[in-house]
Amino acid sequence: MIEIEGITKRYDETTVVDNVSMVIEPRTIATIVGTSGSGKTTLLRMINRLVEPTSGVIKLDGADNRSVPGYQLRRSIGYAIQGHGLFPHRTVAQNIATVPLLLGWDRDRIKARVDELMTLYQLDPQAYGPRYPHELSGGQQQRVGVARALAAEPNVLLMDEPFGALDPIIRTKAQEDLLAIQKRFGTTIILVTHDMEEAVHLGDKIAVMDAGKLVQYAKPAEILARPASGFVETLVGASERPFRL
């Protein structure tokens, strides 16, 4: 369980995240949606302390996320970003093995985990493991990025616009892959997106951010049926395609 309690982030006189409180249940997907500058990415990054809050507390399974050093916390939380963030001079297998290696896993355990994840993502380990990121398609790079984020078996996976750079067909496949992987591993996922349709499709609950404030946090059906503000209603109405509940 992730408990966010009164989290605020200010830069000088600018409040980027303003007194946000929410609870994310274990083994669920929470999507955070909002326009550019709404504070959604800053909120996400305060969970793994890439950004330190000005005030408030974030608890992971009851423990304050400041109770361990930041680098140690980040090794226990998966993190996937738009554009995959792969190391260009490391092979696919080496990229996926990054965090398990830092955690001191033995070679056989690392290989087994890399092979498992590559197979789950329909990437043959023998064929794709030795390749470099530039030898992959955009969709394949994205899959490797998520596999790397999951490699150390984290209970929590943070995703910042992970599918934003993909074309619509590949993006749909990536979303379905994520739902299947989440169901298999039971990972708690927090995913930031600017796309309300994606938020509805993937999220067990949706957090809508506007100007640093959490304006609604509810299940997709409730967001669609009873938007809490004109801003939420505008986001719901902005999609040109039907929502899939």
Annotate each predicted stretch with a short phrase.
Residues 65-78, 102, 226-227:
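ABC ATPase NBD coupling module
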Residues 157-160:
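Catalytic Walker B motif of ABC-type/P-loop ATPase nucleotide-binding domains
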Residues 153:
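Conserved catalytic motifs of ABC-family nucleotide-binding domains
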Residues 48:
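Helix-to-loop junction immediately C-terminal to a conserved catalytic motif
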Residues 131-136, 140:
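Conserved ABC ATPase signature
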Residues 217-218, 226:
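ABC ATPase "signature
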